[in-house]
């Protein structure tokens, strides 16, 4: 590898002495770690906090899975890489398109640039929706790259993933999508890849099924973090550089009777502006709606008549639980969003509220526990835990989760 590698106008070290490992622990906020630590369930993470770094940083807005995973692996916000939700809307065609195809990426990943410089890359993600985005720019024909998901671990091939027969290799069956097992598979695979494949860079991305269902301190949540800690201990070998962060936090979003706490914005705008005059887009929506019912804290709104923007904003602002209501240009500048993939208006809800489209459009039949969700400013703050001291923080300003690889790679040079 060269002495330095430039990725999206940021300079990263080219010569690594150990493996740089970043883990995106989906849906994690500091309270999960704190509660598990009180019961002495996380000795390895506690050691990181004591001897390395225990920081709180911002995730990208919207605080959803796709934008933040891609921010972490490009080192930049979605204004640069283009992935600003799980899906987006094209007004000219009326299409709502899942944003999991690499054609929507506008910037290379750190993996791609390091791979092109000769590095070995290992990536394991819980859900397959991220896999093609994460592996974009990698080739799997020279034994230098591996990328697969827990969800479709039984469908891997050398050509597509750089590995085959993962379940036999790992000794674990394909986990249920809605289970702790999906994330445990990621961690177990990461440990085995570290010791056998010996990558220069490794990225492990879990799923937030547990965090959507269980609050910090609940027994199931504590069990999850104890499991995670065990694998962290197995990754913390040979002076490897490890940073644990998250794509977003999580907040309770239910009424006292257990039903979801939501403002159905499409219904409101249909009444105030007229039918078919607006389109409310909820970028949290993806194929895995069982645990959130497509309700999150962020929405973007397209208007048929652009002259109605101020009127629409004034109507939305009548609801105190919609805390942020901004025009496209103001919101995109403030939160580093791609203007052409956002609507005319951008909204974020209060801490315990979500934004829905039409009440009849949301299916809660599979939502067994009180709703916990994310997407806005109240779920933005996430942990940033390093096993090594960071001596060269670029600024005293708050860091972002997408600084993780910058500091993990720096830590791998010593």
Question: What does each of the following model-derived ranges do?
Answer:
Residues 2-53:
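Active-site-proximal N-terminal segment of extracellular/periplasmic enzymes that hydrolyze or transfer
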Residues 14-15, 179-244, 248-252:
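A long, amphipathic alpha-helix that forms part
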Residues 18, 88-101, 107, 212-215, ...:
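Secreted, luminal/periplasmic, and some membrane-associated catalytic domains
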Residues 30-32, 65, 129-135, 210-214, ...:
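Short catalytic/ligand-binding loop motif for oxyanion handling, primarily in non-cytosolic enzymes
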Residues 34-78, 122:
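Short, structured active-site-proximal loop/turn typified by the sulfatase FGly-forming signature C/S-X-P-X-R
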Residues 75-215, 291, 297, 308-312, ...:
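His/Asp/Glu-rich, glycine-adjacent segments
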Residues 105, 190, 223, 278-295, ...:
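A short beta-strand-to-alpha-helix junction
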Residues 349-410:
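Low-complexity, glycine/alanine/valine/leucine- and proline-rich hydrophobic stretches
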